[in-house]
């Protein structure tokens, strides 16, 4: 880097703000100067975050502010995993970015077992993105009038909302919750291959402005307090999303004969079903958890980081129910994930390393989101089967010990 000591001095003196460098220099130089600024501020020398291959200019336009470098997370793969989906058909290698030792090995074992047993059957049972603003009125009487007006004028609201986007389609506005004199209408959209949060926020905001204006003509006061009123529910664990779904809602299942359970998991169907009942149902219930599963978040998190999804949505992907049912001749095993917000275009999917991981799955770009969702569901199934099998067989501690974790 050239000598920019005068710029650094002005930054240290507060004369130049770090974000102002983007307009003064190109993206690469601005990033380097900010990095030097932090080094001087905290008294360390960066040796690793300065080494990366992603395009700073593109990242700074779309993904990050005050950029000083990039971090690296170890990337492995699990597979092949045979998937019998509606959109994902065949064998896939699953990219997993994680610093948790033994995770990839566990998912890989699950992939191997599922593939040997005929593959995972996967379906996306629902597909939507939601935004629920908070609307304030003068009384509960007015709140009811606003609720009824929204329902009666849905088609007009739909036209206004959809005028902001080429891809978003407003499907419904339900439920419309009333608390005191406030309303929380849940706008439900189809968003194509984008995860869609920005899309639905912009559309909902315009719809709210329309609602305010039209009701003002009728002498009813209504004010949008916040375009997101937390009934969406975005980036938080939620009973609303567990029941009603958000993003992609996915079910993945596999059937193993008793012989296959004995051979590959070194345990019995009955033992796995008991672990699932006492751990995932009873244990989750007494702790008031909404994740009736062993570790969906592990697989969701590793895939999200690898493929450029919004990492804050990992908490939503952690919701769901694992089923392990003993049949006469074996084990029916399934995972139900009601809330997986994902996309194959936009956001972090543009970042070069994340784009390559989506390409590894054949899932980058348009018309790929449902295929990607089925792959995610199958990968979670693999991770869940492997862990519950290890717990039932009493092998979990041994596995971590052998892998030196």
UniProtKB/Swiss-Prot annotation:
Gene Ontology MF terms: hydroxymethylglutaryl-CoA reductase (NADPH) activity
EC number of the protein: 1.1.1.34
Active site: 100 (charge relay system), 310 (charge relay system), 400 (proton donor)
GO biological process, any: isoprenoid biosynthetic process
Keyword set includes rRNA-binding: no
Enzyme class: oxidoreductase
InterPro entries found in the cross-reference section: HMG_CoA_Rdtase (IPR002202), HMG_CoA_Rdtase_cat_sf (IPR023074), HMG_CoA_Rdtase_CS (IPR023076), HMG_CoA_Rdtase_eu_arc (IPR004554), HMG_CoA_Rdtase_NAD(P)-bd_sf (IPR009023), HMG_CoA_Rdtase_sub-bd_dom_sf (IPR009029)
CDD domains reported for this sequence: HMG-CoA_reductase_classI
Annotated pathway: Metabolic intermediate biosynthesis; (R)-mevalonate biosynthesis; (R)-mevalonate from acetyl-CoA: step 3/3
Name listed for the protein in its UniProt record: 3-hydroxy-3-methylglutaryl-coenzyme A reductase
Organism expressing this protein natively: Methanocaldococcus jannaschii (strain ATCC 43067 / DSM 2661 / JAL-1 / JCM 10045 / NBRC 100440)
Gene: hmgA
């Amino acid at each position: 880097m050239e000598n920019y000591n005068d710029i650094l001095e002005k930054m240290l003196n507060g004369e130049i703000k770090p974000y102002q460098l983007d307009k003064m220099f190109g993206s690469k130089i601005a990033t380097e100067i900010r990095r030097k600024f932090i080094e001087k501020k905290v008294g360390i020398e960066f040796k690793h975050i300065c080494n990366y291959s992603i395009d700073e200019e593109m990242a700074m336009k779309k993904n990050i502010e005050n950029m000083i470098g990039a971090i690296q997370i170890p990337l492995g793969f699990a597979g092949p995993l045979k998937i019998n989906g509606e959109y994902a058909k065949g064998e896939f290698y699953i990219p997993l970015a994680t610093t948790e030792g033994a995770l990839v090995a566990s998912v890989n074992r699950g992939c191997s077992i599922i593939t040997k047993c005929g593959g995972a059957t996967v379906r996306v049972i629902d597909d939507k993105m939601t935004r629920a603003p908070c609307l304030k009125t003068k009384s509960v009487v007015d709140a009811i009038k606003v609720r009824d007006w929204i329902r009666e004028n849905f088609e007009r609201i739909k036209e206004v909302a959809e005028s902001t986007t080429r891809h978003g389609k407003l499907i419904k506005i339900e439920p419309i919750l009333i608390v005191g004199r406030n309303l929380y209408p849940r706008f439900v959209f189809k968003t194509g291959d984008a995860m869609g949060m920005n899309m639905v926020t912009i559309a909902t905001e315009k719809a709210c402005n329309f609602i305010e204006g039209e009701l003002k003509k009728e002498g009813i006061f209504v004010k949008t307090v916040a375009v997101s009123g937390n009934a969406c529910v975005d980036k938080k664990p939620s009973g609303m999303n567990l029941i009603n779904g958000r993003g992609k809602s996915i079910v993945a299942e596999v059937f193993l004969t008793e012989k296959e359970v004995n051979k590959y998991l070194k345990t019995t169907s009955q033992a796995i079903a008991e672990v699932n009942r006492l751990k995932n149902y009873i244990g989750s219930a007494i702790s008031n958890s909404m994740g009736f599963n062993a570790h969906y978040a592990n697989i969701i998190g590793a895939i999200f980081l690898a493929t450029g999804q919004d990492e804050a949505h990992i908490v939503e992907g952690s919701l769901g129910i694992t089923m392990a049912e003993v049949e006469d001749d074996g084990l029916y095993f399934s995972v139900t994930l009601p809330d997986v917000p994902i996309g194959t275009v936009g956001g972090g999917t543009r970042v070069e390393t994340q784009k390559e991981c989506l390409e590894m799955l054949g899932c980058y770009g348009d018309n790929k989101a449902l295929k990607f969702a089925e792959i995610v569901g199958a990968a979670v199934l693999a991770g869940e089967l492997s862990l519950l099998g290890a717990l039932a067989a009493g092998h979990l501690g041994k596995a971590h010990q052998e892998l030196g974790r």
